[in-house]
């Protein structure tokens, strides 16, 4: 079985991989990092006009990092909007994924948080800097191979 976006991508010979459907019937697609920006633009034009959420996670110690996008197709008069989940995987050594800030502005803080916690660089993001951790923090706290420092001095806020 294929979702509507997946069927459309197949019809137009755009490379992706279906990872199946979740318990709510939402299809999850895997997109290569180098194809992500063009498929994001296509998804927006296709009608996925709302980025419900973006998050990231460490797949396994020493393994890939994943950036996950939950897109919704909001249309006037439709009670059950169409949704899709897209996963973009990046290599741990130099994790780079194109930013979708210029398509969905709501990705701004979410991509910054993923950068701050996991070290995924979102190319062409206008303000990619730490958002939760101090600028002086070393490392990426949500990576499975992260070693927490024994001591960290927090500066006063004057």
UniProtKB/Swiss-Prot annotation:
It is an enzyme of class 7 (translocase). Signal peptide: none annotated. Pfam families: Complex1_30kDa (PF00329). InterPro entries: NADH_DH_suC, NADH_quin_OxRdtase_su_C/D-like, NADH_UbQ_OxRdtase_30kDa_su, NADH_UbQ_OxRdtase_CS. GO terms for cellular component: chloroplast thylakoid membrane. NDH shuttles electrons from NAD(P)H:plastoquinone, via FMN and iron-sulfur (Fe-S) centers, to quinones in the photosynthetic chain and possibly in a chloroplast respiratory chain. The immediate electron acceptor for the enzyme in this species is believed to be plastoquinone. Couples the redox reaction to proton translocation, and thus conserves the redox energy in a proton gradient. This is NAD(P)H-quinone oxidoreductase subunit J, chloroplastic. The gene is ndhJ.
